[in-house]
Amino acid sequence: MTSPSAPLTGSIVALVTPMHDDGSVDYPALRKLIDWHIAEGTDCIGVVGTTGESPTVNVEEHCEIIRVSVEQAAKRVPIMAGCGANSTAEAIELARFAKKVGADSQLQVVPYYNKPTQEGQYRHFKAIAEAVGDLPMVLYNVPGRSVADMQHETVLRLTQVPGIVGIKEATGNIERAQWLIRDVPKGFAVYSGDDPTAVALMLCGGQGNISVTANVAPRLMHELCVAALAGDTRRAMEIQFRLMPVHKQLFVEANPIPVKWAVQRMGLCGGALRLPMTPLSQGNEAVVEAALRAAGLL
């Protein structure tokens, strides 16, 4: 489901990073997860993003996760490498590495904590694009986590920068997404970063969904995206209604706490997290399990 003018369309899993109980990255489990997603129909695998615990892996680990993912995917599906940082220099370093090892695109989040102005955001992303060259960049706007919010006008400025090909819009605000879809130039992709509103965004003209739920329901999310992108509202909403409890309960605590518990419960990989993330509370384990069962995933 690729396009010459954008990295991809369809279901992009925001993949968890498997870890051993001691907190070290479980690379064999990562390889198995990638194989499973390919078999289940995931259109693209996004690694080392928010769901992949990017804030708590060091640069060496970050690079190794990208390298292993690219190697294991072996061009069977594209790899979208999370390369975001609140230091422009570090983001460039990560993106250069991703390009060197063969990633298909990079995801660059709005710098968090240091709260750059709109001009600072523009210069940050422009500097990365100019430094890294032809590795397609997808912007990532998630003000609920980064605090800084990339405004509509800033996105439009960035659409004119060579190499910036899309945006993951994770506000869940469909009106805002519609304005973006209306105003961005042809060939610039708008992706949902919010599972509950992903169908609506795609039916409005968005190109896909960068999904947490796809960690536990990859085939269903792929089918949902196929239907929504084809304008088949009935089929898309049939799947969406089935997955709504999962969308909701995977955020009953901060992501990726619930989804890490869910993938362990499903036997896909271990559920260990790195501090300051802590395990899902016992009470919420039952809530997440009920959602998985309601969707037929257990």
From Swiss-Prot:
Catalytic activity: L-aspartate 4-semialdehyde + pyruvate = (2S,4S)-4-hydroxy-2,3,4,5-tetrahydrodipicolinate + H2O + H(+)
Domain of life, per lineage: Bacteria
Known EC number: 4.3.3.7
Keywords from the UniProt entry: Amino-acid biosynthesis, Cytoplasm, Diaminopimelate biosynthesis, Lyase, Lysine biosynthesis, Schiff base
Entry annotation: catalytic residues: Y140 (proton donor/acceptor), K168 (schiff-base intermediate with substrate)
Biological pathway: Amino-acid biosynthesis; L-lysine biosynthesis via DAP pathway; (S)-tetrahydrodipicolinate from L-aspartate: step 3/4
Primary site of residence: cytoplasm
BP-aspect Gene Ontology terms: diaminopimelate biosynthetic process; lysine biosynthetic process via diaminopimelate
Pfam families: DHDPS
Gene3D superfamilies assigned: Aldolase class I (3.20.20.70)
Feature type site, description Part of a proton relay during catalysis: T50, Y113
GO-annotated molecular function: 4-hydroxy-tetrahydrodipicolinate synthase activity
PROSITE patterns from the UniProt entry: DHDPS_2
InterPro entries to which the protein is assigned, alphabetical: Aldolase_TIM, DapA, DapA-like, Schiff_base-form_aldolases_AS
Binding positions (pyruvate): T51, I210
Entries under SUPFAM superfamilies matching the protein: Aldolase (SSF51569)
This protein's GO CC annotations: cytosol
Cell compartment(s), UniProt: Cytoplasm
UniProt subunit comment: Homotetramer; dimer of dimers.
Family statement: Belongs to the DapA family.
Function field: Catalyzes the condensation of (S)-aspartate-beta-semialdehyde [(S)-ASA] and pyruvate to 4-hydroxy-tetrahydrodipicolinate (HTPA).
Protein name: 4-hydroxy-tetrahydrodipicolinate synthase
Originating organism: Acidovorax ebreus (strain TPSY) (Diaphorobacter sp. (strain TPSY))
